[in-house]
Amino acid sequence: KIIENAGASAITVHGRTREEFYTGHADWDMIKKVKESVKIPVIGNGDIKTKEDALKMFKETNVDGVMVGRGALGNPWIFRDIIQYLQGEEILKITNNEKLQIMLEHINLEVKEKGENVAIKEMRKHISYYIKNLPNATIIRNEINKIDKQDELVACLTEYFNKLWIEIN
């Protein structure tokens, strides 16, 4: 209420305390109570990892919007999926080729923004999220952690996804 009275046009509520950090579950009941106590839009955040989680938060808390955090790591298309899901549209599963193309674009943008040395090191963690749950992810992750050049990283990922395509088909 204090924030609303101070002139805020919206409030984002993360259903965890600083002490809880990433442990346990976000307190959606608290988010719902905030929504019920103010007239300005409330955006709920916490434990949104799937399109179904987003719908569930909307239904359970009556928030005006949802914010996705860690659920977007390695899964940036979650935003498209949520919108399509909420609109009742068919959700097209992302292919491994599309995933590779997104990773390569991510690498290019990161290198352009931060330079090769910093970007390749930072991309290691992002790639780990992208390939999570894919076959041989641990092996490829170990290889990627030794790479410090963009062209080597691109070649490694391309080879991995080509092998993946052959194994699947």
Which residues fall in each region the model found?
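Alpha/beta catalytic cores of nucleotide-metabolism and tRNA/nucleoside-modifying enzymes
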Residues: 1-10, 22, 29, 33-44, ...
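Glycine-rich, proline-tolerant flexible connector loops at the mouths of alpha/beta enzymes
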Residues: 13-23
